[in-house]
Swiss-Prot record:
A Pfam family of this chain: CENP-T_C
Subunit-structure text: The nucleosome is a histone octamer containing two molecules each of H2A, H2B, H3 and H4 assembled in one H3-H4 heterotetramer and two H2A-H2B heterodimers. The octamer wraps approximately 147 bp of DNA.
Species annotation: Chlamydomonas reinhardtii
Protein name: Histone H4
Source species, domain of life: Eukaryota
Length: 103
């Protein structure tokens, strides 16, 4: 294994990397009805029109923080796959303990 690290099964010199489409503005995929449903589940009766953009902003920030911590745990364990336990530990670190996903 010529310096390929853990699990280097590849033949040849490496080949081209696949390109992934750059994802922009996907936060708009959290639709107005989806936010309404979440609010209803939380017991909200009426919703101001300004709530939707603010909710998207807060959700994006929250997910960025959780994902950043999860990826940190993954990299520390020298893995390439984020596991459910990485997310559980990331949430616990932020003071939001989640039960039911192992550990």
């Amino acid at each position: 294994m010529s310096g390929r690290g853990k699990g280097g099964k590849g033949l040849g010199k490496g080949g081209a990397k696949r390109h992934r489409k750059v994802l922009r503005d996907n936060i708009q995929g959290i639709t107005k009805p989806a936010i309404r449903r979440l609010a209803r589940r939380g017991g909200v009766k009426r919703i101001s029109g300004l709530i939707y953009e603010e909710t998207r902003t807060v959700l994006k920030t929250f997910l960025e923080n959780v994902i950043r911590d999860s990826v940190t745990y993954t990299e520390h364990a020298r893995r390439k796959t984020v596991t459910a336990m990485d997310v559980v530990y990331a949430l616990k670190r932020q003071g939001r303990t989640l039960y039911g996903f192992g550990g």
